[in-house]
Swiss-Prot record:
GO terms for molecular function: rRNA binding; structural constituent of ribosome; tRNA binding. SUPFAM superfamilies: RL5-like. Belongs to the universal ribosomal protein uL5 family. It comes from Buchnera aphidicola subsp. Baizongia pistaciae (strain Bp). Part of the 50S ribosomal subunit; part of the 5S rRNA/L5/L18/L25 subcomplex. Contacts the 5S rRNA and the P site tRNA. Forms a bridge to the 30S subunit in the 70S ribosome. Keywords: Ribonucleoprotein, Ribosomal protein, RNA-binding, rRNA-binding, tRNA-binding. The lineage of its organism: Bacteria, Pseudomonadati, Pseudomonadota, Gammaproteobacteria, Enterobacterales. This is Large ribosomal subunit protein uL5. One of its GO terms (cellular component) is ribonucleoprotein complex.
Length: 179
């Protein structure tokens, strides 16, 4: 099992249960899934860019990404409905905990000029979204073998009912929020 999950089960869930006065352990918020997304707008011009993005996301997540397609045609962006414009991965179970542990302890400390994440990126229901500007901060990506710098959107979906509960959950994991 993953050490971070054991820490959640044995320590964090008990703290949250006391702080929010939950009557059942099932009410305690938990991390439901983590979604990684790379948008490749240049894929309309050159399809190889999408292949490189898929390769990067496969290395980072450990599973094959789903290709996202345009929902409608937009002439100014030169895309048509059904064009592949990105890729995404949804992590659950042990892969979710492995990725979250790597994110907190390895990836985030490698971000240049990092001062903490904003606590305003919650969506109102306890889910948190992060935008990372460079995929090269992940140790799985070899700097010499990339074709270009790409950003990655990371969404941490929780079972929390409010932003306050989601913030308390992520703070308990020592997630680096700006103070």
């Amino acid at each position: 099992m993953v050490a971070l999950y054991d820490y959640y089960k044995n320590s964090i869930s008990k703290k949250l249960m006391l702080n929010f006065n939950y009557s059942s352990v099932m009410q305690v918020p938990k991390i439901d899934k983590i979604t990684l997304n790379i948008g490749v707008g240049i894929a309309t011009i050159d399809k190889k860019n999408l292949d490189f993005a898929i390769s990067d996301l496969t290395k980072i997540s450990g599973q094959k990404p789903l290709i996202t397609k345009a929902r409608k045609s937009i002439a100014s962006f030169k895309i048509r409905k059904g064009y592949p414009i990105g890729c995404k991965v949804t992590l659950r179970g042990n892969r979710k905990w492995d990725f979250f542990e790597r994110l907190i302890f390895i990836v985030i400390p490698r971000i240049r000029d990092f001062r903490g994440f904003s606590n305003k990126s919650f969506d109102g229901k306890g889910n948190y979204s992060i935008g990372i500007k460079e995929q090269i901060i992940f140790p799985e990506i070899d700097f010499d073998k990339i074709d270009r710098i790409r950003g990655i959107n990371i969404t941490i979906t929780t079972t929390a009912l409010s932003d306050r509960e989601g913030y308390a959950l992520l703070s308990a994991f020592n997630f680096p929020f700006r103070t």
